[in-house]
Amino acid sequence: RSAEKLICNTYGKEQDYTQKTGVEFKKIYAPSHTDKHLSDRQTLWNEVEKSELKKNGEIKATAQLAREFEIAFPQELNQAQRQKMLDELCQKIVERHGVIADACIHAPHTASGSDERNYHAHILLTTRSINERGTLGKKTREFNDQGKQQVEHWRAQFAELCNRHLEQAGSLERVDHRSYKAQGSELEATQHEGSKVTQLRRQGIDTEISLKNDAVKARNAEKLASEQLIK
């Protein structure tokens, strides 16, 4: 995510991502008492792997090294506003869960056909919280035991942040994290298309998912047009 060259100590391999472009911003967020050496990205993720090793030096088959949040920024925000919003979100995550967050903002790859408004961020969270010594401690269980509730909490938090920053930017646009059903709306939700379907779209190739989504969008457009006529 960070477009860096990282060395995996566990397997002695070098992972070179320096050819990746479009990283607008990157930062590691951690509790204030965290050992300073964990603010280095390579050290951090090597320590994460080390915490999941078996006695024979191999990573446990069931090991989960990180959790990931992916967020999309409102197109009305500029670079400084996106960074400020990410700062606030990651600080909230760190405060609530006591973990480290490794976050990167990516600019859209317009050369490959990506929507120029698609500024987004990847936030990798350690699955272990920081203990009293400032090092990786126990596994966080809340995402396992209360996954749905935690996801809903952060969706709501993100929507609140979006709307506050949109207001500060002087925009009248607002977002709502709730489903159309929860909002009492008759609009239909589309299905997430993913990178493969998106790439095929750019090539002019239809898929079952893209065709269904296009039909949903058309029906939604008709409903919105009807509502405008009724008003």
Predicted regions, residues:
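N-terminal nicking endonuclease/strand-transfer module with a His-rich metal-binding environment
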Residues: 1-231
